[in-house]
Amino acid sequence: KGHAETPFWQWVCSWARAVRRPSDLGFDDTRFVLPKLHENEHLVQAQSLPDGMLFALPAVGLKEQREERRRTVEERCAMVAELVNSTGQPALVWCHLNDEGDALENLIPDAVQVSGSDSDGRKEERLEAFAEGRARVLITKPKIGAWGLNFQHCNHVTFFPSHSFEQYYQAVRRCWRFGQKRPVTVDIVTTEGERGVMRNLQRKAEQADAMFSRLVLEMNSARGIERINEHTNRMMVPSWV
């Protein structure tokens, strides 16, 4: 509830710390400020409608959302290929389905795909090829390559939305991270049916930002926190108790 919000974050800060940038600890951000991040949403028109529907509506529930994603693989992948092929620059292309990865690999001539069925050696070889610039475009899934990799040579990311803000955050941060010298563009490709997925992803992003901001605020003022109700008076009880 609203009246307990501040005490809650004060309690969290008694056992947790949050740091996003040097200024969160009172230092200067000058040498840490990242280039601008440009996030673009591209709404793709589906070529077919769900059974029994006269026009496109946002999918309701996970079942309908999965069906929407599988039904629009061709249209969404074509949009990503158009965005990536038009630049001639390195691009990091994220997908979630095997069908998406295979379609993208066919549509982007100079791309390499890292899939779950690849051997560890093959994965390493292809990831290194992209990192070293021998492959212009890398296609993979967040659960495979969204953690622990540095691709600062690339400043173009495409993403199919999901309900996981963590996946989106980590996927973007492979390129938009310390050491990146150019503005980073993220093209989010979706359909009318996935409006609900996008809204949920945006809500989680806003909540995550609010959480970090509040944690940093309370963390920095923690030294001034005092207990408001400190019951130090001994209770008076009858002598016969």
Give the positions of each predicted feature.
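A short beta-strand element within the Helicase C-terminal
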Residues: 149-162, 184-188
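Short, solvent-exposed loop/turn segments at secondary-structure junctions
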Residues: 47-49, 97-101, 119, 144-145, ...
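Interdomain linker/hinge connecting the two RecA-like lobes of the SF2 helicase core
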Residues: 1-91, 95-107, 204-228, 237-240
